[in-house]
Amino acid sequence: MNKKDKKKAPQKVAKVLHPLSRKAKKLTLEGIRDIKKEKNANIRKKEQKPIKQLLDHFQEIVKKENKKIFTESEVSDIIDQFLKTKTPEEEIKQVTSRTNKLEFTKSQHNDEIKEFKNNGYSVPDLTNANYVRFLLNWDGDMKYITQQSLPLKKFKYIEQPKNEMETDSK
């Protein structure tokens, strides 16, 4: 007898579930639960995107500067630099084009600048060595960022005296 002649065992046919059975209900609820989890994860990512951009920018600066502690004026300069790099035109290119999207992003950008100059802008506290070290070692995953691990502190705009500004330009 050849191997070809041997009969293969019939494959098991998947059991058909009755639509009103408990198992069918359980499977549909699991499917709905998975969809909700995915939807909530997408919403969470969308809400955390501006914070992640801010933290990425600060992490890049901290790695470049290689300091353990920053002064308040240095943090103010970093915030000012971040707000200047974050222009509405760049954001509009990333998002699908709408007619009023450019005006909205420009007004939002202007509001952020006003908030920074008047009330203060919430950023990671780089005046503490522990938080600077945490930001240096951070791998970019937002699930590790909590209020205890990296608290946000408000910093106001600090204007540099004219003497310092002249020496910077030379």
UniProtKB/Swiss-Prot annotation:
It comes from the Eukaryota. GO terms for cellular component: nucleus. Pfam families: Tma16. PANTHER family: TRANSLATION MACHINERY-ASSOCIATED PROTEIN 16. Belongs to the TMA16 family. This is Translation machinery-associated protein 16 homolog.
